[in-house]
Amino acid sequence: MTTDSYLLTVTEVIEETEDARSIVFEVPPELTDTFAYVPGQFLTVAVPSERTGLVARCYSLSSTPHSGRHQITVKRTVDGYASNWLHANLRAGDTLRVLPPSGIFSPKDLDDDFLLFAGGSGITPVMSIARSALEKGSGQVVLFYANRDERSVIFAGALQELAARYADRLVVVHWLESVQGLPSAAQLKAFAAHFTTYTAFVCGPAPFMKAVTDSLKELDFPRARRHQEKFVSLGGNPFGEVEEVLAAQAVLDEVDDGDEEGDEPGAAVVTGPVTVEVELDGEQHTFDDWAGDKPLLEFLEDKGLDAPFSCREGQCSACACMVLEGEVTMRNNEVLDAEDLADGIRLACQSMPASEKLRITYSG
């Protein structure tokens, strides 16, 4: 199963740095509700590909919901097909296929005090959170922003303007590897030690996030006030059999010898019927007929529930839920770490029942 995708027109392309550009989409009035989002969420974009028709990539929204703007920011990477294509080919007036906003890297209360850590292009969702907190919240915002050098600082001008406008609420600390070297665990811990009552959000390269997260743990930041976003490249196709994919498949079918067999679906630990209680959007639902023949996400969709998701491949955290009672097994997991799993967090798109009764919440 897939969700509906939409062709959106690019209204503006902004060159932020030599390697980063922001892309602004026009969302028609009839899709306003469909593309409503909260700070920290992302869009899944279909980037054209001659081989497969498209490749799916998730890019964080760097704009704010209250601005009415839908802007993603893409940093070009050396071996990144999608980012290089978007930098080399995309212009204002072009269209891209896009899925509605998704993701759980979002603050629950904009009035909180925030400690934000961003490394490189990890600033994109963090910028949305910072702007939203400053413009719609009432707390303090502290941003630690690490980059290779001064020329690689995305949103340098915008951050300077925000710091001037909110001088009594915003502190921005720039850390440049070319000047100060990589931030050490001790330096990160010493910095965070001044803000142990704040809610922390971390996004950037994996080593940076690990160093920050380890520092926060040592300072006894509770899990509820520690959030991190991992950037991944999706390997599957969440867009379904759209025109671009069918056209590419037709070309492949011409040379397919037809001898290959598809993979057998993995067997569920429990074949049902399984009883599952689900809390979603503040409402309780109980079902007693999960046969264990499909993942939790698909089962809930069959029941008419609007459960969150994006990639369906276990490569993003959009469908994350918390298992309060019972057990599930995941067919694939590329984003949840050991601490997530210990806390009961699971990916609904990959979760198969491993007990006869389950209690699950999406409000964790």
Located regions from the model:
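Local cysteine-cluster metal-coordination motifs and their immediate loop/turn environment
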Residues: 125, 301, 305-330, 340-355
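Redox cofactor-anchoring modules in respiratory/redox and cofactor-processing assemblies
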Residues: 228-302, 318-323, 351-364
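Short, surface-exposed secondary-structure boundary micro-motifs
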Residues: 48-50, 101-102, 363
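FNR/FR-type flavoprotein reductase catalytic core
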Residues: 84-265, 275-277
